[in-house]
Amino acid sequence: MDRNRASARLTVLLRHLGCRSAGTIIAHHTSGVGSLASFHPQQFQYTRENNVLSLEQRKFYEENGFLVIKNLVSDADIQRFRNEFERICRKEVKPLGLSVMRDVTITKSEYVPSEKVVSKVQDFQEDEELFRYCTLPEILKYVECFTGPNIMAMHTMLINKPPDSGKKTSRHPLHQDLHYFPFRPSNSIVCAWTAMEHIDRNNGCLVVLPGTHKGPLQPHDYPQWEGGVNIMFHGIQDYDKNNARVHLVMEKGDTVFFHPLLIHGSGRNKSQGFRKAISCHFADANCHYIDVEGTSQENIEKEVVDIVRKKYGFKDVTLKDVWTFRGRVVKGERINL
């Protein structure tokens, strides 16, 4: 896509969303159900017909690979998630399998139990309070539009993006989430990502490249950043820099659903506060595992397996084993994953 086409695409996209400034999407309400009677189901590759999404919403996701639903998660639920995260940071609870991550710039001498040294917790499937996010009816109602009725919660995170230290390590390189997942098909996987407070470019909002979900999985590796890179923050090594970029400005409770091939990332947190969001990747329980040997995903397989072996002392663990352990059925029945 050349620069002119990218610019035209972005203009149409922003006009559709009613944005006032180029390069920024302000999350807006997208309720309402449109008739699909005149639109043949075979024309939809990425969404399923269940009378939740309007025709306009389905077309938007099909074309762009993401959809923002405003004010989806309540303030009360978000406060509960925040409280539980703080308990984890203080080491008052230690859920099985949970990974607590710190920014690469924080030295061991700064490991004081508080949210100020924790940049992310992931794999909270054994934390009853945080995992409630993955079972919220308002979340699953939309997830089913992409996965169908048998839904697995596969990957969970609560992100606490810290104020940048000046080394720009709080940013997340552009990447595709499918790079981390050894299961397919990609069209039956979706991420739900909920803002836990106001999020904009100043505190490191998501940036997406609309339409890139239609392309293939790209090779990923660690970017060569002078200030260092956080563990597992792989990025795409070569992508079309002429692609339009859209920054998602979101309010507390707003939720974006996006395809695992959508290229996205986030900027550094230039504010003095911690930017929080909670997310889960869901998949159709009918998805199947693949062997990533000989593919661009070999590097992430080796890294994940090495971490699990060192953390738990397992000798013969595979990437499939890791994801089978993480996965939880949240609606319908468990089938393949």
UniProtKB/Swiss-Prot annotation:
It catalyses: phytanoyl-CoA + 2-oxoglutarate + O2 = 2-hydroxyphytanoyl-CoA + succinate + CO2; 3-methylhexadecanoyl-CoA + 2-oxoglutarate + O2 = 2-hydroxy-3-methylhexadecanoyl-CoA + succinate + CO2; hexadecanoyl-CoA + 2-oxoglutarate + O2 = 2-hydroxyhexadecanoyl-CoA + succinate + CO2; octanoyl-CoA + 2-oxoglutarate + O2 = 2-hydroxyoctanoyl-CoA + succinate + CO2. The modification N6-succinyllysine is found at residues 59, 108, 252. Belongs to the PhyH family. It comes from the Eukaryota. It comes from Bos taurus. It holds the Pfam family PhyH. Coiled coil: none annotated. Gene3D superfamilies: q2cbj1_9rhob like domain. This is Phytanoyl-CoA dioxygenase, peroxisomal. Fe cation binds at residues 175, 177, 264.
